[in-house]
Amino acid sequence: MKTLNETTQQSTRAGRYGKDFGGQYIPETLMTELEKVTKAFNDLKDNPEFKAELNDLLVNYANRPSLLYYAKNMTEDLGGAKIYLKREDLNHTGAHKINNVIGQALLAKHLGKKRLIAETGAGQHGVATATIAALMGMDCEIFMGKEDTDRQKLNVYRMELLGAKVHPVTSGSMVLKDAVNATLQEWASRSDDTFYVLGSAVGPAPFPEMVKHFQSVISTESKQQLQAKETRLPDMVVACVGGGSNAIGSFAAYIDDPSVQLVGVEAAGKGVDTDRTAATIERGSVGIFHGMKSLFMQNEDGQIDPVYSISAGLDYPGVGPEHAALAQEGRAQYVGITDDEAVEAFTYIAKQEGIVAAIESCHAIAYVEKIAPQMAKDQIIICTLSGRGDKDVASIAKYKGVDVDE
């Protein structure tokens, strides 16, 4: 039996980024289903009725548009560039994940699917998928690495509360990559009534394009909002990167504006030069995994190496193919932030702005703390807060040696 990581099918130029990233590297058993998903997405994405249905849910259910908030205290404290925060933490379910899930769930409904499955790391994508499944009357099953179910017990209970069945994945390193493996295997075995709501801009085509399409609402809004506030484009857009959905959504509307610097912030863990890191773009090499060609943390034999981050949402051993291409082309810059720096930023933004941000987002905030003082006061940074940090309070307290009752 062929595994999900064997190259049994290759795409044409469709679904490719840069020189050769992306594509479809999947078993024959999934090719027909992927073709159906691709056709449905291409047929519906510009369909007026589908767009109206999507927009109605984004506005009246997900609470969009999200705020573009001027971080006055941070700006004054850091003494450099003007800082705006794109507040995806204020969306229904508390993160950017809902944008993509609504779009994919509508697609699933149009395909006649009755059951949604998804992987999740920090739990936010799982919560969003369970939420929309409840709204649309669909069955839902979530696959989550055992390490992550232990780290994110509150989100596990939230998913179950919403009616989802959560499967702790005990294979491999028991983290996000293993949850993706398990979900792909489940989809391959039962695609007739099931739709895989992939949470990040990864996987075989059309998933990276589809996730970007649904997440691009972040930058479409921020571009319009900043134009209304400042009548100009930002000088820099900053977002954290695991697989890369929030970052590609934050970058999308600016990619064709070379005056806007794009910065993706990866999880350096204990340090980029250690073996306890998830800084894929800085440390990874080209390979094939999870149905795509991209950059991965892997050994000389092409076996995926374990990765580490304090953040369950950023410890993925690869990155979306468009991010790999943007890095290769020099259009975007990717930097690493350590656990210690992210934890410091968690406290910093809370005390400066009264915002408890997700530890994933705090990797981006930590970079803003470094770069803003080096910029002129008439320059502007937009930093995306991908989610809220309620889920992280207990683990951050533990990291700091503070005993709290979860």
Curated annotation (Swiss-Prot):
One of its GO terms (molecular function) is tryptophan synthase activity. InterPro entries: Trp_synth_b_CS, Trp_synth_beta, Trp_synth_beta/beta-like, TrpB-like_PALP, TrpB-like_PALP_sf. GO terms for cellular component: cytoplasm. It catalyses: (1S,2R)-1-C-(indol-3-yl)glycerol 3-phosphate + L-serine = D-glyceraldehyde 3-phosphate + L-tryptophan + H2O. Coiled coil: none annotated. PANTHER family: TRYPTOPHAN SYNTHASE, TRYPTOPHAN SYNTHASE-RELATED. The beta subunit is responsible for the synthesis of L-tryptophan from indole and L-serine. Belongs to the TrpB family. Tetramer of two alpha and two beta chains. NCBIfam families: trpB. This is Tryptophan synthase beta chain. It comes from Lacticaseibacillus casei (strain BL23).
